[in-house]
C-alpha cells in the first residue's frame, strides 16, 4: 500500500473545544506574512484541511491548526487556524492549546525552576504574546495571552431573522475575528446544550443576513472582512462566572469553549459601553459552563476606532498523538460531511 501523505498531529481540547494541531507531514507554505501563507494554503492546499477536519478523520464541529514556520522572526512558530468550513485569522482556544503544547512538548525552552514561560506565535491577525504558567512540578497550569487590539465596530444594528419572523438588534465587535453580539433574551432562549441546535440555526441566519446587508471591513488589515461568528450572551449559570455565551460559526458549528476571540470582542464591547475599565476582568462561561478569564490590559487605537488589548486565560489538555495517512486510491480521501 502506498500513501501520498503522512500527517502527524497532537489532539487537544481547550475548555471542551477541539484543537487538532498538525505538526508534521505538511509542505512549506510560501508567503511573506501569515496572511499570505493562509491564502496560499486556502488556494492550493485546501485538500489538507478537508482531509483532517472532515469525516472520517474529523467531524462537522472539528477545529484545528497547521503549525508552520513563522513569517515574523520574533515568533516561536506560525499558526494557521482552520475548521470544517474554512480558515480563521485568529482563534483563542487554539492559541491556548498551541502554547500549552509548545511547553509540554519542548518547542520552547523552559529554564529550570521558572514558573512562567513566554511564548510568541505568528497568526494571520498578527503576533500573539503569551505566558504559560507552570505549577511547582513544572507542568502547565494555565495559559494567558494578549490578544490583538479589539474594538466595537458597529452598534445597534437591526437584522431580520427568518425563523423568528422578527428583527433582532446586534452589535459588531472585533476580537481577532468579527462577531455579531446578540443578547439571548432577544431570541427567548436559554443558553444550554439542549438549545444548541436552534441557537446555532438562528446564529447562522444572523451572520448571513449581516454579511448580505452590512459592510464589515477591518480598518487596517484588508484581508479581514465580514462577520465570521455570532455570539449570544446571557446571565451566568455558575456563581464563579459573570456571564455566559454561545458562539456559532463556520458551517453551523458550535464552540464548546467560551471562545477567546469572542470573549475579547465582548469585553471590548463592554469597555465601549463604559461597563469595564482598564484593569478590570470578567469570567465568561461557555454552553458547557467551562470558563475563560478576560482582562483589559490597556487602551489603544485601531485606525479611528477606540480599542483595547485584552488578555485571555484558560487551560488546555493533550488528549492524543495521531498519525494520519492519505491513500490516493481512497475515493473519500479529502473527507465528507454527512448532516
Predicted features, each with a name:
Residues 1-173, 180-339:
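A glycine-rich beta-to-alpha transition motif near the start of alpha/beta enzyme domains, typified by
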Amino acid at each position: 500500500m502506498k500513501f501520498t501523505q503522512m500527517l502527524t498531529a497532537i489532539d487537544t481540547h481547550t475548555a471542551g473545544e477541539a484543537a487538532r494541531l498538525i505538526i508534521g507531514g505538511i509542505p512549506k507554505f510560501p508567503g511573506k506574512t501569515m496572511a499570505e501563507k493562509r491564502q496560499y494554503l486556502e488556494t492550493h492546499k485546501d485538500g489538507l484541511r478537508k482531509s483532517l477536519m472532515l469525516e472520517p478523520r474529523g467531524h462537522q464541529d472539528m477545529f484545528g491548526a497547521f503549525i508552520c514556520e513563522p513569517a515574523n522572526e520574533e515568533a516561536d512558530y506560525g499558526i494557521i487556524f482552520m475548521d470544517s468550513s474554512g480558515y480563521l485569522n485568529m482563534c483563542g482556544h487554539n492559541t491556548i492549546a498551541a502554547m500549552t503544547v509548545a511547553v509540554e512538548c519542548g518547542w520552547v525552552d523552559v529554564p529550570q525552576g521558572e514558573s512562567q514561560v513566554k511564548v510568541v506565535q505568528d497568526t494571520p491577525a498578527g503576533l500573539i504574546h503569551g505566558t504559560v504558567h507552570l505549577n511547582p512540578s513544572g507542568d502547565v497550569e494555565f495559559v494567558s495571552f494578549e490578544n490583538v487590539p479589539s474594538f466595537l465596530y458597529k452598534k445597534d444594528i437591526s437584522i431580520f431573522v427568518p425563523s423568528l419572523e422578527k428583527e433582532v438588534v446586534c452589535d459588531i465587535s472585533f476580537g481577532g475575528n468579527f462577531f455579531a453580539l446578540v443578547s439571548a433574551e432577544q431570541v427567548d432562549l436559554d443558553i444550554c446544550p439542549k438549545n444548541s441546535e436552534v441557537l446555532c440555526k438562528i446564529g447562522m441566519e444572523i451572520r448571513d443576513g449581516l454579511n448580505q446587508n452590512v459592510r464589515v471591513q477591518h480598518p487596517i488589515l484588508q484581508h479581514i472582512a465580514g462577520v465570521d461568528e455570532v455570539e449570544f450572551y446571557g446571565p451566568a449559570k455558575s456563581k464563579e462566572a459573570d456571564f455566559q455565551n454561545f458562539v456559532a460559526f463556520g458551517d453551523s458549528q458550535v464552540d464548546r469553549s467560551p471562545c477567546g476571540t469572542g470573549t475579547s470582542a465582548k469585553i471590548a464591547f463592554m469597555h465601549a459601553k463604559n461597563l469595564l475599565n482598564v484593569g478590570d476582568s470578567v469570567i465568561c462561561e461557555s454552553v458547557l459552563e467551562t470558563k475563560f478569564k478576560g482582562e483589559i490590559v490597556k487602551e489603544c487605537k485601531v485606525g479611528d476606532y477606540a480599542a483595547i488589548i485584552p488578555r485571555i486565560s484558560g487551560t488546555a489538555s493533550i488528549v492524543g498523538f495521531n498519525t494520519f495517512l492519505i491513500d490516493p486510491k481512497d475515493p473519500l480521501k479529502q473527507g465528507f460531511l454527512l448532516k
